[in-house]
Structure formats: C-alpha cells, structure tokens
Amino acid sequence: MSSAIFISACQKEQTSDDFTITLRLSHVFNVNEELAQSIELVAQRINEKTKGAVRILTYPGGQIATYKDGVEMVVRGAHFISVEDPSYIGDYVPEFTALVGPMLYNNFDEYMELIKTPLVKGWLKKVEDKGIKVLSLQYIFGFRNLITDKPVNTPDDLRGVKLRTPGSKLFIKTLNAMGATATPLPWGETFSALQQGVVDGLEGSEFTNLGTKVYETGKKNVAFTKHFLGTCGVYISTDVWAKIPQQYRTIIEQEFTYEAEQMIMQLKGKHAQVVKDLEAEGVKFNAIDRPAFEKRTINLYDGELPGVTVEMYDQIQTELKKIRARAAK
C-alpha cells in the first residue's frame, strides 16, 4: 500500500526562514480507510506546524506513482516520498523483506518492539546507504487474511484458487506457497476482476474489507490466516531529504510517527466492532490449521525470496523471543 510526494523547492541552500516546499502525496488506500485518514491528518498538522512552509496535497487511490514504481523514483533521487510495504525497499536491502515475512507476528506490539531494536536500526542504516531515508516504519493497518467465497482451513483448500495480490515478490511467493495461485493486480482493478471471475478472492485486513466494501463482491468468507501483518513505511530520497531544513525534517518525522502510533491505538480498539459490522453484512470467519500453513511458508526464508536468508529469519526470531519473554512477565 503506497504514497508519492512531489517536492518543489529551490536547488540552492535555503534557511528555514525562506524555504517553502509543496508535497504531492498519493496512496492506494480508499478515503474511508484509516490509513488514508491518518495521512490526511499528517498533512494538515505538518502544514500548520511549519506555518505553511511545508504543504502536502493528498491524492488517494493511487492517482500517481505507487508500489515498486514509487520506491524506484525515491532511489533515483526523484522528489517523491513513497509510503509502502517494507518489502518494496527489500528489493534494495533484503532484510526488510524478511522483516515483514509470512507468519512472524502474533500481535501489533511484537512488530512495534522489533523495529526499535539495534538489529532493525542497523538495517535502517544499510538502506540509507542505498539512498533511501526511512521516515517511519510504524504504520500498521491490520493483519492480512484470506477473503474468498468458501471456508479455507488448510493449504489443500487453496488448490486452484486464484487470489489477487499486490505485485511484491514477497506477496506472490507467499500466496503460492500457501497453496493458492497468486495473481498480481493493481488495487484499482481488483473489484472488476472479482466480479468477472478473473480471480476467486483476495487477501487483506478486516478494515480494508469493511472500508472498501469488499463483501459486496460476494466474497463473504474470511479465513484468519494472519499470514502478513499489514504495514507501511514512509520513504524519501536521502538527497531530497538533505535539502529540507532540519527544523522541518524534525516536524515531518514526528508527525508521521505520532499519527502512525495513534492509528495503531485506534485499530486495536476498533477491530472487534469491525468484525461485528462485517458479520452483519453476512461475512463469516473461520480459524485455520496454522501449523500446516507455517510448514509451507517457512521455506521462503531459505532462498525462495531474493536475498533473504535463514540467518535473517533466525535473527528476527531471536529478538521476538526476547520481546515475548518480556511481555509474559
């Protein structure tokens, strides 16, 4: 899920007194979804706190560059900010693909604690050396589950089932490993593809299901696979970032971080009600044979994903064990 921000600024060195910048922000989320609303609040507060020096214009629904295209523009030094799943920067530093790999997290807090560790901070430095400044990794929009028209309990239930997925290699390989036939499509084409039978289902969070009315396509069964924790990072070119005065850089980072944390709190409080609202629309939920799916996806960490290694997986698991031990006290 992604954003692009075009930055217009003078090329010469400027002080915060005479610096102005206009940011065009695009993301694939529907205006009714929490992340879209959160981004809108960030834009408003940055404008207010910089007294108009940093102005952000938001464009929902992927009206400008998204996904891999947006991240590529950042890497090339274009005046964009990409808000996207960390696996897209995993194309440059594979550890970020491992960070959001399948079947890792039991809850939001585990991920939030992991990204604060020295392990992940070291990865942040590595990706900065590639020209990508990470402004935030904190955006979470819920666990991603399978949405189909029949119950899915085991990998065998997915044989021959075509599932829409984003174009990320991580998503494609994970859905295939789980037993489905991954079918990458832009989000804007998903509903027509479902209605025309091009795909049999998709994967996403309950918040996306309700906010975009996925259930109206007739796909009214949700399997609680929790195969991915839905996350987004915020990325900008290191060269572009260097042009912005420190005073404004601090505000930008603080506002993205603050609003992401607020969004997580809201999601935790809303999930149970969202499930009830979906059930009122006829959506049914079922548990899965999780060990059976984990057995299928664990091999992705051993050479199935470009650059991802078992060592990365083991490093993540070591940190998660520490985090879970602290939480259990």
Where are these regions (language model features)?
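Bacterial N-terminal signal peptides
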Residues: 1-5
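N-terminal secretory/targeting leader peptides
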Residues: 10-109, 119, 127-329
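Active-site-adjacent segment of FAD-dependent monooxygenases/related oxidoreductases
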Residues: 111, 115
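Alpha-helical scaffold segments in soluble metabolic enzymes
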Residues: 122
